[in-house]
Amino acid sequence: MATLHIEHPITDLSTWLGAFSRFSEARKSAGVNAERIQQPIDDPNYIVVQLDFDEAAAATAFKQFLETNVWSSPQASPGLAGSPRARVLESVTAR
């Protein structure tokens, strides 16, 4: 399993959630099988998203889609304030 971990400042939660919802089909088509949205308890203008994929390649491809088609356009990413930080993570096992 791989997780696309994304975090960034937002203008407000309602606007951001509306934009996030518009891309639900894109997430499904890309192979997202679970998602988590969280905020720091002390910062309502910051969001953390984790999207789970079966394969790292699918997570990497979706990261590239977001960078090229979503985050590069203010019209496609209302609610985004600042630059997102995104990384593809894989689970490790303690020995």
Over which residues does each language-model region extend?
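Short structural boundary motif marking the start of a folded domain
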Residues: 1-4
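Short acidic/glycine-enriched loop/turn segments that link adjacent beta-strands
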Residues: 42-45
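Residues that line or immediately flank small-molecule/substrate-binding pockets and catalytic motifs
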Residues: 39
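Residues that cap or initiate secondary-structure elements
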Residues: 12-14, 55-57, 92
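Short, surface-exposed ligand-recognition loops at beta-strand->loop->(often short) alpha-helix junctions
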Residues: 9-19
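An amphipathic, aromatic/His-enriched active-site/gating alpha helix that lines ligand/cofactor pockets
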Residues: 17-36, 52-86
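Short, low-order "capping/linker" segments at domain edges
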Residues: 87-95
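Short hydrophobic/aromatic beta-strand micro-patches
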Residues: 7-9, 50-52
